[in-house]
Amino acid sequence: MFNSWGRDPIAELVRPIDVMGRKSELLLGRTEHAVREESTSVIRGIRHDGGSAPSVDDIRDALELAYPGLVFVGWSAATLHGIEYAEGHRPEIWLPSQVRRQGVVVRCGRLPPEDVVAVEGRVTTSVVRSAVDLARFAEGDEKIVGVDQFIRIDRQGRSLTTKPAILGYLDTHPRLYGANRVREVLDESSTGAHSPWETYSRLVVHRSGLDFFRPQQPVPGTPFHVDLGSARYRVAIEYDGGYHRSKEQQRIDIARWNAITDQRWTIIRVTSPMLLSGRAAFLDRVARELRARGWRGPSPTVPPLKLPTIHRLNTVMEDETAGQILHNGVQFG
């Protein structure tokens, strides 16, 4: 017998007991104390032999063992589709009926079969549906981070999906819950963000009123682009994260910055602390540079930045995306 996704639930449950299983399975021939000493909890109720911390794949295996009919959705789907910075979030699954499980985001509701695909042997939502779900359910401005990563154009001119494809999905699903939220996210999304903090930098600058700064702005006379740039005023804004700390990257950056400033551009570097608690000073610096180059617009306003609940400087590295704090059993559909 196969379930609606074409999987054999019996085959899914046939796993070597000495690798992973429910506690009752691991007890065969062993005491409860021995099981606790010789195995490690992967998710509540499922353990694997050995003392090593469970990997992401271990957690996926355990969830599939517990729920043979699951579909990986949201950030879990994004990870399977190769989205950078998607790891670090709680596992997120869809089930045909409501359940609650500690540490797992569980969604339910209508999920059309055509929105379900297999990736790396896992059952997950399609690329477009995964992007739509992040736009509906991710926390705060991580909605925009997620969609940015799905539509980001790489050096070969490729992206996983596009804004028109996502809008097309909404057009063919007119009663989809949260569709207006998806459209709002798309309005602020961009194909030019290479990391979450580049997204946050753009949101702060654009929401302040300086929306003429272009993501991945080419610098004439050089082979380079800048994270955000105004070609008219020759002002560039560059996010300076941990990636730029290595000696080799600093050497590359200095040569690049020299080439850009040789074209009479100025470069303003921004860091995560500035975006989190120094937005007023950062935007004032940008405005002063613009005015020195002939800009006569109104002073920028300091906008909100809706970061995920646990995204704090003392707990999350500045180049990482934060895990989201969500209630289990959120309605899906």
Model regions: which residues?
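Short gly/ser-rich loop at a beta-strand->alpha-helix junction or flexible surface loop bordering the NTP-binding
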Residues: 1-178, 291-333
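Surface segments flanking catalytic/ligand-binding clefts of nucleic-acid enzymes
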Residues: 4, 16-20, 24, 155-333
